[in-house]
Amino acid sequence: MADSSDSVSIDMEALSLGGQEHLVETTYGPVCVAVCGDPDKPALITYPDIALNYMFCFQGLLFCPEASSLLLHNFCIYHISPLGHELGAPMISVDAPLLSADDLADQIVEVLNYFGLGAVMCMGVTAGAYILTLFAMKYRQRVLGLILVSPLCQAPSWSEWLCNKVMSNLLYYYGTCGVVKEMLLKRYFSKEVRGNGHVPESDIVQECRRLLSERQSTNVWRFLEAINGRVDLSEGLRKLQCRTLIFIGENSAYHSEAVHMTTKLDRRYGALVEVQGSGSLVSEEQPQAMIIPMEYFLMGYGLYRPTQSVSPRSPLSPTRISPELLSPENMGLKLKPIKTRLAL
């Protein structure tokens, strides 16, 4: 566990999500963690996708009043940034060793130890979802549950590996050029919000494009290399004992990956919710679709909206996933029943 001399605290009150950022020294290098909420509450850690940070991956979700009240009432949120993905991050030295996905998962343990956290709830998007799933498999006693958005769980297909290699080379030699931005935007969003010659880009895509322009391309390249070298987690998924709620956009490039992951999880613990008309970044594109499934999911841990009289400081004792997830109507979502999957 790091001592106080290993952390630099930065006042982030000006940021839209509030909280305070800590630069925590780990065996694998410094990692930026933004802490939002009451540290006496149970911990929720988040991990973003490639080239993004917590503000872009989870801002849309936390700006929904219902989601904000549900999560911030029950949790203290620890937003973990991959190396060099925080705002204003310097370029990582070219002499620094490349980290693997395993290294990034191990780094999370050091972060938890630094803050004195035990078992935590986890929320991740795509590459971040893979890192958190790997973390849950390696350190089962440190994970209460997983909320995954468009997760990866298999090794890259040849087409994905090649696409990532092209993007990796472009990042390394040309920086975050226009082609790289388009590849990443296609990764995150559906065609509807990306726009075309007749329909302008949505505000969230324009904001994301601006964010990508500010990224340190070498830092993004490092995270991409780690994810492109990932291994298949399929065989170990059934041994996961934590509850897992998976969201997948109907138009996500990783739709089949999420379905595959659900089939590999223990049927008692996993649920898949498909959100129609969304790309991979459901938490930004259609965050309101996540609220009711998350609410029922957290009920299994005795966690409720603020109107309930249950203390969020009480120990979490997970039960099975609520049966209400079986019914799209009860979730308030217009989902295709065959694509709304729950295993009890």
UniProtKB/Swiss-Prot annotation:
Interacts with the heterodimers formed by GB1 and GG1, or GB1 and GG2. Interacts with RGS1. Keywords: Cytoplasm, Growth regulation. InterPro entries: AB_hydrolase_fold (IPR029058), NDRG (IPR004142). Involved in a signaling pathway that modulates root auxin transport and auxin gradients. Acts partially by positively regulating the auxin carrier PIN2 and AUX1. Acts, together with GB1 as positive regulator of meristem initiation and branching. GB1 and NDL2 positively regulate basipetal inflorescence auxin transport and modulate MAX2 expression in shoots, which regulates organ and lateral meristem formation by the establishment and maintenance of auxin gradients. PANTHER family: N-MYC DOWNSTREAM REGULATED. It holds the Pfam family Ndr. This is Protein NDL2. Belongs to the NDRG family. It is found in: Cytoplasm. The keyword Cytoplasm applies. The gene is NDL2. The keyword Cytoplasm applies. One of its GO terms (cellular component) is cytoplasm. One of its GO terms (biological process) is response to abscisic acid.
